[in-house]
């Protein structure tokens, strides 16, 4: 299991610190990282709190060495071939195309993969847990996808309907496996 905690709002880092402690006991197999990290200072803070990876909505070359020194993956948001190439040169093994739906969709990823076939691309933004949405992304060559509110609807979370969320996750994983077959 991989889970990205969104760094948004006052005291988000404090919540993350408590989440890391809880996950260590309740879900020791979970890989927990911090997202929406836009500067090196914030990356350092989350690394000290136990983040296993850092994700950003943009590529900030100052974050890469902070993560590289600790051998922690940094996945920056990129919206062009140049940004993806620069992120890879800075040591980022997985780049995030964000916002994927606005950047050009699956055709953008497919076109990037032609000259940069070694790229590991994660897409977020406009990714939905449906077969119609996931299949084109997987066929375009993405390594993985990121989903938030479409996978964890607010009303379902508020109702504590964890069975529905589990079912939606399993369904999405099934679509991904089918697209990769």
Describe the residue ranges of each PLM region.
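Hydrophobic faces of well-ordered beta-strands that scaffold small-molecule active sites
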Residues: 1-5, 30-36, 54-55, 74-77, ...
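Active-site-adjacent beta->alpha loops and helix N-cap segments on the catalytic face
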Residues: 5-24, 40-44, 54-88, 99-117, ...
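Glycine-rich beta-alpha junction loops
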Residues: 125-131, 149-151
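Long hydrophobic alpha-helical segments typical of transmembrane helices together
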Residues: 145-181
């Amino acid at each position: 299991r991989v889970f990205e905690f969104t760094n948004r709002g006052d005291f988000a880092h404090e919540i993350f610190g408590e989440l890391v402690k809880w996950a260590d006991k309740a879900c020791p197999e979970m890989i927990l990282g911090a997202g929406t990290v836009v500067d090196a200072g914030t990356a350092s803070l989350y690394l000290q709190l136990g983040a296993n990876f850092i994700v950003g909505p943009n590529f900030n070359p100052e974050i890469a060495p902070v993560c590289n020194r600790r051998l922690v993956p940094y996945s920056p948001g990129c919206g062009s071939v140049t940004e993806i190439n620069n992120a890879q040169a800075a040591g980022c093994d997985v780049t995030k195309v964000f916002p994927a739906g606005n950047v050009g969709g699956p055709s953008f990823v497919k076109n990037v993969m032609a000259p940069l076939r070694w790229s590991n691309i994660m897409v977020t933004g406009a990714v939905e847990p449906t077969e119609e949405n996931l299949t084109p992304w997987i066929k375009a060559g993405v390594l993985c996808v990121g989903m938030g509110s479409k996978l964890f609807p607010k009303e379902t979370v508020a109702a504590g309907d964890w069975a529905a969320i589990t079912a939606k996750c399993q369904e999405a994983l099934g679509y991904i496996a089918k697209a990769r077959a």
